[in-house]
């Protein structure tokens, strides 16, 4: 009896950012999650923070700077040039992001950027938290069942 193991296939599988059930369970136990999305809205990375994003200590702006770090047009639209990014405590890849983002500019671009930002804040638990953290379950179920 011989077992054929194709190391290349296994490596490609692991590098393709497959979301395992343990990752899903971990996300559903996290309190403060920020989702990075493709241009079509599909979540690509879940960034986990141990502290809540707040306006009074400006951590919400620092998280936004991290979230849009690779999109200078959005950083400029949201006036985040002088803000230091706040790195997450952990990030979990959900899917591969190989799409180009459209260049955002003007009032419409600002509205799209803000919409994307405010839809990024999620929570995996049902404790009382600020209104801008939406339930995560819907997004994760969509990814796992695809």
UniProtKB/Swiss-Prot annotation:
Keywords: Late protein, Virion. It is found in: Virion. One of its GO terms (cellular component) is virion component. Induction: Expressed in the late phase of the viral replicative cycle. Its main location: virion. It comes from the Viruses. Belongs to the orthopoxvirus OPG114 family. Part of a complex composed of the kinase OPG054, OPG092, OPG100, OPG114, OPG115, OPG142 and OPG157. Late protein which is part of a large complex required for early virion morphogenesis. This complex participates in the formation of virosomes and the incorporation of virosomal contents into nascent immature virions. This is Core protein D2. It comes from Vaccinia virus (strain Copenhagen).
